[in-house]
Amino acid sequence: MERREEQPGAAGAGAAPALDFTVESVEKALHQLYYDPNIENKNLAQKWLMQAQVSPQAWHFSWQLLQPDKVPEIQYFGASALPIKTSRYWSDIPTDQYESLKAQLFTQITRFASGSKIVLTRLCVALASLALSMMPDAWPCAVADMVRLFQAEDSPVDGQGRCLALLELLTVLPEEFQTSRLPQYRKGLVRTSLAVECGAVFPLLEQLLQQPSSPSCVRQKVLKCFSSWVQLEVPLQDCEALIQAAFAALQDSELFDSSVEAIVNAISQPDAQRCVNTLLKLIPLVLGLQEQLRQAVQNGDMETSHGICRIAVALGENHSRALLDQVEHWQSFLALVNMIMFCTGIPGHYPVNETTSSLTLTFWYTLQDDILSFEAEKQAVYQQVYRPVYFQLVDVLLHKAQFPSDEEYGFWSSDEKEQFRIYRVDISDTLMYVYEMLGAELLSNLYDKLGRLLTSSEEPYSWQHTEALLYGFQSIAETIDVNYSDVVPGLIGLIPRISISNVQLADTVMFTIGALSEWLADHPVMINSVLPLVLHALGNPEPSVSSVSTLKKICRECKYDLPPYAANIVAVSQDVLMKQIHKTSQCMWLMQALGFLLSALQVEEILKNLHSLISPYIQQLEKLAEEIPNPSNKLAIVHILGLLSNLFTTLDISHHEDDHEGPELRKLPVPQGPNPVVVVLQQVFQLIQKVLSKWLNDAQVVEAVCAIFEKSVKTLLDDFAPMVPQLCEMLGRMYSTIPQASALDLTRQLVHIFAHEPAHFPPIEALFLLVTSVTLTLFQQGPRDHPDIVDSFMQLLAQALKRKPDLFLCERLDVKAVFQCAVLALKFPEAPTVKASCGFFTELLPRCGEVESVGKVVQEDGRMLLIAVLEAIGGQASRSLMDCFADILFALNKHCFSLLSMWIKEALQPPGFPSARLSPEQKDTFSQQILRERVNKRRVKEMVKEFTLLCRGLHGTDYTADY
């Protein structure tokens, strides 16, 4: 292991220099760390002390800092330095010093057995990491030796102190193994050695746990030690006696938590499923906890009920398949399942009265998966047993999903409400999963219950019960195709009978209707049963999200059946928009809903509705355009522009978004004449320009204007063609006055859709040349303040090369300047900008042969590009961007091979470039590897990743384990 270089520095004023890591200087730095009020001095001291801990001198001062006359803070620092040395710098220790180091650690642990516990733990960690480094060859019976040494009668420390110290050492040993940095082959050897050594540990633990005279602190430590060892995947049958003792210890409240942890860890080991006989012996032990569980629930003892539930779930969830296979024991496993059911349905509202039920949900997934994985005959038998259980589970889950009373819910904190919301989502996911087991019968079951509830005249029903049943329907309908269910028509008929007196119920009614929108599209005759409810809810601000999102779903899925209701929907929507009932985001959704709705109407109807819908906003915008800019009218302008752009996002009379849905879709004939959106845009174009003239320097307003056209272009595609010339002209004026990234993004859309069409090429070429010229000027003035503009510009250039390389043929385009600016952009600190620049070069380099100006500039300035790429790989850019730079190298190699082979050797020639950590041989190997690989891009990426690690001095370190 390489030694770290020590940095010169001091632990504050008057402290020793960095290389003078003496006891005195360390003590002085520690005093500064703990007691100096100056935070800067504290930070300096901490940095210096961290260097001290890894220095060679740490071997000397650590022992001196452990002297009895030192205060605990100093002793703790000395003890903390030792595990760092024994784990990370083991190679520094000469082999002839192993034994003396071991003896010193044993001595110190014995001395601190009755001293500071935190110091004792650090010393135990040091000895544990030393043992792991020596096992199995240099210290074959490490654990047995530890036990023997601490049981020696001639120790000055009392028996209980020695016992606790030994247990601490035995506890940290497996924990250190789990987090150790041992090489993989050594880890396997040490794991095997530890598994053998558990024979020296478990008898001792059993004896201490079952010994009546053992004090509570010792027994608790025993349980923690056992919990640590079982995670080494010790065979379950070897733990049987200790597990039984841990079950007995559950009756002791002081030992309860430690016992639960030990039992759960033992049961949860993956290999435990092989020990079926031991698992079968555990079922009665778990079932024996039911009375303790009931008492805990009755007394409101959440910790005890939580712990027992963890044990039951650990056994059921980890081993359901193995236990289901034991057919002759089906009744005992069913009893365990019913115990877990009790935990799922534990009384009280989650998370205020209980936090246990959520632990059980994954078990029901696992059990169902295991049952459904059996062959047909066996599955049928288990279905017969467990279908009733799963129907009971549905009842339990819907009961748990019920809201508390309004009064009680009002006292809940926002955090508790959020936890309950997440819990209900988990229940929803479980119900959706359970549908696979129960099928259509589940929907019938829910429908029957809801029907009885809503039609019963005997007793008044609670809204919570109704809401939960509807929530069950919604959970299933959102993800499962219910189009063929025979109960949905009845449900649609029941929904209007629900008396909605509460926002939670209103939300669930709305979301349920939304979940059934696809069904409504196939059964349009039922739309009128629920649409009035949705429109009525729009007028209420409380169920805003649910009502607006449901209307949007209906308008999207059922638009071809909505023309008879269109006037009413538009009128209600217009009313709520004018009254400003909803927040901004819901207003935007509502406009999207109206866009879907209008798409299915005749052009004349669309224009008529558009006129009535947006005229008030146009009038408002005209008024705002006359006013002097201020923050208040800016918000209003952005809001109106947002409404228009969201409307145009979905208003598509060509039905582009339906193209993937097959020929059977009922489409209207494609209308002749101008698109209604284009008609409206042309009408308001002058007004938008007027607004822009006053707000050109405001990025938010410019972005909102560009969004209208960008969303319209994306939706209308070729239908947008009549607007192209005037939009190009407007964008040019906008960008010339004040460059904004949003204008470049819109230009990119125009290039993508229209640049290949001869009729539109001239205005687009003129715009492209203009924005390029303006942006190049920006680069001359200093582009670092505008990473967003540079990012968008690079994306525009890449799109132009991809879609219409002819744009680079124009003599007025300064390709050389563009190239140099892109090289500069590679050095930006912002990752998105660098990615966009790399994307530009990967599009540019393949054009070397076909576009003369590109070929010329690559020949002249390509070496500059290569140097920038190598600098980035050498450490100037984030490691996350290496794939992007690898793409450039691959493109250079593929399209400019002869040039690259010359440049790369020249570029890597200077010593220290691109990193001082590289040898000439490593640089030569890299250049040869790159030049050889012209086909496999993935291999080039691997080479670059390997090379950048060498450049950064990270090759072979822990930092790169997941890289």
UniProtKB/Swiss-Prot annotation:
Keyword Transferase among record annotations: no
Disulfide linkage: none
GO biological process: protein import into nucleus
HEAT repeats: 24-54, 56-88, 95-135, 142-179, 194-231, 236-268, 276-325, 330-372, 375-438, 440-476, 487-522, 524-558, 562-600, 603-648, 676-716, 720-754, 761-803, 815-845, 860-893, 897-931
Keyword Cytoplasm belongs to the record: yes
Ranges of residues in domain Importin N-terminal: 45-111
Transmembrane regions listed in the UniProt entry: none
One cellular component (GO) term of this entry: cytoplasm
GO MF term set: small GTPase binding
Keywords: Cytoplasm, Nucleus, Protein transport, Repeat, Transport
Subcellular location: Cytoplasm; Nucleus
Signal peptide location: none
Subunit comment: Interacts with UBC9, RAN, RBM8A, eIF-1A and PAX6.
Known role: Functions in nuclear protein import as nuclear transport receptor. Serves as receptor for nuclear localization signals (NLS) in cargo substrates. Is thought to mediate docking of the importin/substrate complex to the nuclear pore complex (NPC) through binding to nucleoporin and the complex is subsequently translocated through the pore by an energy requiring, Ran-dependent mechanism. At the nucleoplasmic side of the NPC, Ran binds to the importin, the importin/substrate complex dissociates and importin is re-exported from the nucleus to the cytoplasm where GTP hydrolysis releases Ran.
Family recorded in the similarity comment: Belongs to the importin beta family.
Record-given protein name: Importin-13
Designated gene of the protein: IPO13
